[in-house]
C-alpha cells in the first residue's frame, strides 16, 4: 500500500513512539546539515551511540554469524528482539532495508538501517532503526506498535521516504536523490545460516567420499571467514552489506561508478565531478574507513585496486551461493560443494612424472627479483572443468602451459565458472593490456597475486593450457591492446628476462617453458621495460585449466 503523508498530529505520535528504545534511552538521528556537528542527547546509563557502543571493533571480531528466520536476519544489535522476532515479509516484500550515503566534502560516510519486526510468540510488531558512521554501532530506536501492522508499515515507509525521497512501494524504480541516502540492493535468496545448526547438520551427514586432499582443498577455498577477512583488508564494509547479500546489479552499479571515476581521471577533472563520482561509488559499495575521510580515488593504481575489490566481490558472491546451497540430503557438505563446482580435481601422485615436471617448472621459474619468499609444493590437482575441453580452440597453434595466481577467496568462482574476462561495464584502466585473461611464464610473477602472508602462508596457483596462436608482441603496457591484434590471437608483453627456449619441454601436447630465466635482450627505447613476460588472451575458449597447485609460502626473516 502507498505510504500516507503524516499530519502534524500523526508526526508527534511517531516521534513519541520513537523515544521507546529498548534500553529506555532516547536516540537522536543524524539529520544535521552536512558539515555541522550533531548534538548529543544526555542519557541515563550507557549511551546508544556512546563510546562503548560506537567503538570500531577489531577486524578479527567483525565476522558474525547471523541467526536467520525468514528471508533476512534481525540486526544483531537489536538486543530486545534478537532470537525473539523475525523480519516481517509479505510474499517477496521483505521489510528490511540498508541505506548508505557518502559525502567526501563533509567527511560523511554513514548508514541507516530500517527493519519491521514481528514477534515469534505473538502478532506484535515493532520498527527497528539504527544509524551512524560506517564501521560504528551508532545509535538506535525501537518503536513498538503492539498488534497494529498498518502503524508499523506507516512508520517504516515514512522513514524510508524521509531518508531517500523515494516511495517504498516504488523501490524497484529507485532513483538516488542528491543529499539523500541510496538503497543497497540485497539478495534475500542468499542467506547465512546459524553456525551451530550448520555444524549439527554436518555431524548428521555421512562421511565424505572425497580424497582427503580434495577435502582439505575445499575447506581452504570455501572458508567464509577467510573471505570476510580478505574483504575487510580491502576496506569493504561487511557489516553494512554482508557478503553474499549484494546483488549482481549492485556490483554492476559499482563498476559503473568506477567508469565515471576513470573518465574524470583521463580528462584531468580532479574537482567536483571526480568527488561526486567517488561519493557515488562509496555509497553503492560501502567502505569502512573508521573516522578517516574517505579518500578521493585520483590515480590509476587506486582505481585498479577498486576494480580488484569488485572482482573479488563477484567471485565471493558465487562462492557463497555455492557454499550455502543444498543443505538437505544425505551427502556430506564438502561433497555437495565439490559437485556444484562441476570441475573434477584429481590429486597427482608425488612420484609421478607430471608432478615432478610441475615441481621443476615451479622452482626453476621463480624470478630473481622475488626474493622475499620461497615456495614449497604441497599438492597438485589435475583439473578437468566441465565443458572446457569441448570449447577449447584446439585449432590454434602455440599452446603453452602458463601460470595464473589469485586470492583464495576467488577460487570457487574460478573453478565453477572458469577464468573470465572483465565485464563490459568495468573501466579499462587497471588492465595493462586490456580486459583479458592474464598469464605468466614465471611462477613467482603469478604467485604474487595470491597475496599470501606470514600468517596466511597457503596459496593456490593454476597452470592452464593457453592457445596463444599468433602473438602481438608489445614492449609496453597498452590498455587498448585488444584493438591492436589485427588478426592475431593474443598479446605478449615482452620482458627483460624469460625462460630460455633451449629448456622448453612438452607435456600432454603443451609447451612447458622450464627455467631458469635468462636475459632476453628486450629493451623498450621509449620508456619502462617489463621485467617478465605477460601473456593475454581475450576469449575464455583459448584457456583450458589443467593443474591446480597448493603452495606453502616461506617468507624470509627481515632481520
Swiss-Prot record:
Report the subcellular localization.
Nucleus; Chromosome
Give Gene Ontology CC terms: cytosol; nucleolus; nucleoplasm; nucleus; site of DNA damage
Instruction: Describe the location of the WGR domain by residue ranges.
Output: 84-181
Q: GO molecular-function annotation terms? A: chromatin binding; damaged DNA binding; NAD DNA ADP-ribosyltransferase activity; NAD+ poly-ADP-ribosyltransferase activity; NAD+-protein mono-ADP-ribosyltransferase activity; NAD+-protein-aspartate ADP-ribosyltransferase activity; NAD+-protein-glutamate ADP-ribosyltransferase activity; NAD+-protein-serine ADP-ribosyltransferase activity
Q: Which residues carry this modification: N6-acetyllysine?
A: 36-37
Superkingdom of origin organism = Eukaryota
Please list the residue ranges that the record marks as compositionally biased, kind Basic and acidic residues.
Answer: 14-29
Q: Where is the active site?
A: 534 (for poly [adp-ribose] polymerase activity)
Q: Which SMART domains match?
A: WGR
The consequence of inactivating this gene is:
No visible phenotype in normal conditions, but mutant mice are sensitive to ionizing radiation. Following alkylating agent treatment, cells show increased post-replicative genomic instability, G2/M accumulation and chromosome missegregation accompanying kinetochore defects. Mice lacking both Parp1 and Parp2 are not viable and die at the onset of gastrulation. Female mice lacking both Parp1 and Parp2 in the uterus display infertility; defects are caused by decidualization failure and pregnancy loss.
What is its induction? By high levels of DNA-damaging agents.
* Stated family: Belongs to the ARTD/PARP family.
The entry's free-text remark on domains says: The N-terminal region (NTR) recognizes and binds poly-ADP-ribose chains produced by PARP1, leading to its recruitment to DNA damage sites.
Its name, as the record gives it, is Poly [ADP-ribose] polymerase 2
Q: Which organism is it from?
A: Mus musculus (Mouse)
Q: What is the lineage of its organism?
A: Eukaryota, Metazoa, Chordata, Craniata, Vertebrata
